[in-house]
Amino acid sequence: MDLLVYLPLLACSLLLFPVMLTVGREIAADACASEISGFQHLNSTGLHLTLHHPQSPCSPAPLSKDLPFSAVIAHDAARITRLTTNNPSRRPTSLHRGNKPVSNQVDDSLAVTVPLTPGASVGVGNYVTRLGLGTPTTSYAMVVDTGSSLTWLQCSPCIVSCHRQTGQLYDPQASSTYASVPCSSAQCSELQAATFNPSACSKSNICIYQASYGDGSFSIGYLSKDTVSLGGSSFPGFVYGCGQDNEGLFGQSAGLIGLARNKLSLLYQLAPSIGSSFSYCLPTSASAGYLSIGSYNPGQYLYTPMVSSSLDTSLYFINIAGMSVGGNPLAVSSSEYSSLPTIIDSGTVISRLPTAVYTALSKALVAAMGGTPHAPAYSILDTCFKGQVSKLHLPALDLAFAGGATLKLKPGNVLIDVDDSTTCLAFAATDDTAIIGNTQQQTFSVIYDVAQSRIGFAAGGCS
């Protein structure tokens, strides 16, 4: 019998139904137990999952609060490299081990690897939730990622390597609904578009995937199917990656849930049952948010159109229309806002703006903050102040998008504490691709309505 039949089936069925669990802003560590009891529920609009900040004490896969902010900067750099180079013309056409090509016909020992460079492109700036998978169902702590398509997680027996994770590995032998995906399947053919890496085929005709990231982190394993069960409902045949060689810094998560625009993403696979929209509220480390898949209340949002880009059709692009500080528009031509394509992303921490826009924003903020003492630059963050954001008085800052949607940013959406005595503007300049990251999205409800090709924003989403 093929080895794959025995591999863990951890399908990241993270998004299953519309999710809208709300939690109080301040969550003490001793309140986490009661929060877990309401982790997921099903109502008339679908399933609601709790979403955690990576450094929340209630996170199922928490990161150390002692993690230096330089690690976040490194994570962002690697992630942006991946997001902005996910183009078939820029990627290899065969699996590689280091710089040596590997045959696309491999044996069941999964002797296909890539460089073992430790990475930080998953699990530092991303948000975490739990998913149920298999029959009987077991739940796993998973990173939520709008910039990835394929859902994957670590599977027993970890033929090559697995990083340390919270909880046990998924064992496919324990699931009566597990199945491997053959090389001749349509899902195997879709891997190139989903991962920008080609698939391989085992000698027993099992499809092998490779998901790689900008800093050398990767997951390689068998493409698999199993049942995702959440909120009392089950979805059979969910396709995901069962990782047997997982290298890099993925925190303590079991794997990653892909929410990008591709046939293999969780959203697209579940769309026939629950609809092609999802929403979330990204919480601060002191609160909890939610992830929701399915129907939603359209009246609570202000919308901006999704736009297409040749950079990567699986990512979510929008257009920035303007910015203002203290009610005054930035001193920059309106054409500068649309000079670069703009991605909205759940995993990038520091947003990137076209250089002219960033320069105008920095000058306007410094002028508006008057005598606030300046601090030295921190890595790429060159507009810094002494103190912490909670102690400073900031002017109103609005971020407007095409179509009329506007984010009225709070201080914590504008500045980010990099250490105990320094806070910096949570934007940086770029001449490549602009990105609206998760710092600016925190505490807002954000809806991705793929069916109507629009993204909506509403204030107070996590409260």
Roles of regions detected by a PLM:
Residues 296-331:
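Active-site gating loop/helix substructures
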Residues 43, 47-100:
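Low-complexity, highly charged intrinsically disordered N-terminal segments
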Residues 2-63, 70, 134-136, 144-149, ...:
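Aspartic protease catalytic domain
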Residues 159-186, 274-276, 301-309, 359-379:
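Cytochrome P450 catalytic domain signature, combining two hallmark sequence patches
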Residues 261-264, 272-296:
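Extended, H/D-rich, highly charged conserved domains that either
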Residues 129-139, 181-266, 321-323, 327-332, ...:
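Aspartyl protease catalytic core from the pepsin/retropepsin fold
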Residues 78-86, 91-92, 96, 103-238, ...:
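Signature of the N-terminal lobe/flap region of pepsin-like aspartyl proteases
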